[in-house]
From Swiss-Prot:
Gene coding for it: folD
BP-aspect Gene Ontology terms: L-histidine biosynthetic process; methionine biosynthetic process; purine nucleotide biosynthetic process; tetrahydrofolate interconversion
Protein name: Bifunctional protein FolD
Highest taxon above the source species: Bacteria
Gene Ontology molecular function terms on file: methenyltetrahydrofolate cyclohydrolase activity; methylenetetrahydrofolate dehydrogenase (NADP+) activity
Recorded catalytic activity of this chain's protein: (6R)-5,10-methylene-5,6,7,8-tetrahydrofolate + NADP(+) = (6R)-5,10-methenyltetrahydrofolate + NADPH; (6R)-5,10-methenyltetrahydrofolate + H2O = (6R)-10-formyltetrahydrofolate + H(+)
Organism annotation: Leptospira interrogans serogroup Icterohaemorrhagiae serovar Lai (strain 56601)
Transmembrane segments annotated in the record for this chain: none
Keyword check for Oxidoreductase: yes
Quaternary structure (record): Homodimer.
């Protein structure tokens, strides 16, 4: 086998360059610069890092960025009031509420308060419902990033057996739906799935989205499989035992440098789409 590395870092830079050019063109036409508002509640160190990365990414493409920092003791009502103000602000195109929020916050209520046309992170129940019905909306960033990687490398998933390991509402479930829209035959697995190794062995495409280091073992994987690892665990380890499995694969994403960079690139891309007043194009 001569496995091909799916270079998310390279593709993300290509996407960001296209965004940068689009913003420059908007400037020449005296159009408003797209703007992303990010809300950080509390002092979670990992969240601080992720938010700073998103702010930096906005600046790198010439996009406006507003970071709203709220105290750990913020109530759900106070957070909803902040989201309402951003919803009504015509200069804000996208709203991102950094997950996780403190335990005292009703996070689902906060996510669902985000206006559909500003839900550039694809986290609202309404966005998820539209995705499930094949209706245009904004998509969860990590799954859509994986779809763009597949398309960039000319991988046609139609008719292939795809196994998604993990069923979170922002990763596993939407990825399964997107692959279904692309005419793959999808099996969605989780902690209660029986005979998981046998199911994975029959897969042409394997998506690691379970959040457990090297949970998907190399000896579960058939020769020529396509491996997309959305996991990122301490020690730069993904959910798939990539180091042992990649030589038998046809395509694979590295960790880091595969799926991760695509997540932020898609966030910026969907913010640009919002500024242009249209949803993300269909994945087919």
């Amino acid at each position: 086998m001569n496995p091909v590395l799916l270079d998310g870092k390279k593709l993300s830079e290509k996407i960001k360059e296209e965004i940068r050019s689009a913003i420059e063109e908007r400037k020449t036409k005296n159009f408003r610069i797209p703007k992303l508002a990010t809300i950080l509640v509390g002092n979670n160190p990992a969240s601080e890092t992720y938010v700073s990365m998103k702010v930096k990414a906005c600046h790198s493409v010439g996009m406006g960025s507003e970071m709203i920092r709220l105290r750990e003791q913020t109530t759900t009502k106070e957070l909803l009031d902040v989201i309402d103000k951003l919803n009504s602000d015509p200069n804000v195109d996208g709203i991102l509420l950094q997950h996780p929020t403190p335990s005292g916050i009703d996070e689902r209520a906060a996510f669902d308060r985000i206006a559909l046309h500003k839900d550039v992170d694809g986290v609202t129940t309404l966005s998820f419902g539209k995705l499930s019905m094949g209706v245009e909306t904004y998509l969860p960033c990590t799954p859509y990033g994986m779809v763009l990687l597949l398309k960039e490398y000319g991988i046609d998933v139609a008719g292939k057996n795809a196994v998604v390991v993990g069923r979170s509402p922002i990763l596993g479930k939407p990825m399964a739906m997107l692959l279904t829209e692309m005419n793959a035959t999808v099996t969605l697995c989780h902690s209660k799935t029986q005979n998981l190794p046998d199911i994975v062995r029959n897969a042409d495409i394997i998506i690691g989205a379970v959040g457990k280091p090297e949970f998907i073992k190399a000896d579960w994987i058939s020769n020529g499989a396509i491996l997309l690892d959305a996991g990122y665990n301490p020690g730069n380890i993904g959910d798939i035992e990539i180091s042992k499995a990649k030589d038998r694969s046809s395509f694979y994403t590295p960790v880091p440098g595969g799926v991760g960079p695509m997540t932020i690139a898609v966030l910026l891309l969907q913010t640009l789409y919002s500024a242009k007043e249209h949803f993300t194009p269909p994945v087919k």
